[in-house]
């Protein structure tokens, strides 16, 4: 839900607890023998937050299916979804840096440890934007276990409801250099104005973000039945990316979509004979319009 203008939170409450939940999912996925991702910093960060629920969850003392009133398949789908999303964006950064990008911006970085765990090329600068207490918590916790950034890490202390583009420029962002931007799982928490705050970025910059899907719980469960690879292919169709000259996060990025015909027959075959409802295809084509002061463009993803 959109955040109020004056709400407060930390990593144990409100939207901050969501960051801890995602980190717990990465910790569980790291232990998964399928080995899709390896985030050795997720578990110590979750433990440091100290929420009993998530600590017990990563210790295997809590059955998320029972606790959350979910079927075992859907509970696992939630964890698999976090793993696949993490891998997808990890690969995005690797592709960007393989193409010569040496400047990265992570919006609402939370407990994201990519600045510490990805093999960044020499000279890569990773900007992490978040509230001071969140950044300081992560920095202190990881320093306490001897972790060191694998890139030049620059932290930007600011709430995304404030003038973060100006703060980013003040922190040293080179507006003439191609930049890889990431908005992972955070657009839905912002009111419209911060989502439309523009920042100048160089040609050949890229942005990727995860957007909300209708009936996400069922979509996750269905999509994971064929395994990680099929899920990854389908997830790729729900993320969006574009290349542009002047950049602005679209105001409708978290909500707009183009639906396709219901696929009740397909879903019934996948869910079993007890499923009788019609469902809008959870992976429709999606057109995102990139607006700027000088030009407009759109991309179907």
UniProtKB/Swiss-Prot annotation:
Function: Exhibits S-adenosyl-L-methionine-dependent methyltransferase activity.
UniProt keyword annotations, A-Z: Methyltransferase, S-adenosyl-L-methionine, Transferase
Enzyme Commission number(s): 2.1.1.-
Pfam family, one: LCM
PANTHER family in the record: S-ADENOSYL-L-METHIONINE-DEPENDENT METHYLTRANSFERASE YKTD-RELATED (PTHR43619), S-ADENOSYL-L-METHIONINE-DEPENDENT METHYLTRANSFERASES SUPERFAMILY PROTEIN (PTHR43619:SF2)
Source organism superkingdom: Bacteria
Protein name: Putative S-adenosyl-L-methionine-dependent methyltransferase MRA_0733
Species of origin: Mycobacterium tuberculosis (strain ATCC 25177 / H37Ra)
GO biological process per UniProt: methylation
Positions that bind S-adenosyl-L-methionine: 130, 159-160
Protein family per UniProt: Belongs to the UPF0677 family.
GO molecular function, a single term: methyltransferase activity
């Amino acid at each position: 839900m959109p955040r109020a203008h004056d709400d407060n939170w930390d990593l144990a409450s409100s939207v901050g607890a969501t960051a801890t939940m995602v980190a717990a999912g990465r910790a569980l996925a790291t232990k998964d023998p399928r080995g899709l991702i390896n985030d050795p910093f997720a578990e110590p960060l979750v433990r440091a937050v100290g929420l009993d629920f998530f600590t017990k969850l990563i210790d295997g003392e809590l059955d998320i299916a029972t606790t959350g009133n979910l079927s075992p398949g859907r509970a696992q789908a939630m964890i698999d979804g976090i793993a696949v999303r993490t891998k997808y964006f990890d690969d995005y950064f690797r592709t960007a840096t393989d193409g010569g990008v040496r400047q990265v911006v992570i919006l609402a970085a939370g407990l994201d440890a990519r600045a510490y765990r990805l093999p960044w090329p020499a000279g890569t600068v990773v900007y992490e934007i978040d509230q001071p207490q969140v950044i300081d918590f992560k920095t202190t916790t990881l320093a306490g276990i001897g972790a060191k950034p694998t890139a030049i890490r620059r932290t930007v202390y600011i709430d995304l409801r404030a003038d973060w583009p100006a703060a980013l420029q003040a922190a040293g962002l080179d507006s003439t250099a191609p930049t890889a931007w990431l908005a992972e799982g955070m657009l839905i928490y912002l009111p419209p104005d911060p989502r439309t705050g523009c920042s100048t970025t160089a040609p050949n910059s890229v942005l990727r973000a995860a957007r909300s899907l209708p009936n996400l719980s069922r979509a996750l469960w269905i999509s994971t039945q064929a395994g990680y690879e099929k899920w990854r292919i389908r997830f790729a169709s729900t993320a969006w990316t574009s290349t542009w000259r002047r950049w602005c996060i679209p105001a409708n990025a978290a909500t707009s979509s183009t639906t396709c015909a219901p696929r009740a027959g397909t879903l019934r075959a996948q869910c079993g004979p007890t499923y009788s409802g019609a469902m809008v295809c959870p992976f429709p084509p999606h057109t995102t319009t990139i607006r700027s002061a000088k030009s407009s463009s759109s991309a179907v993803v």
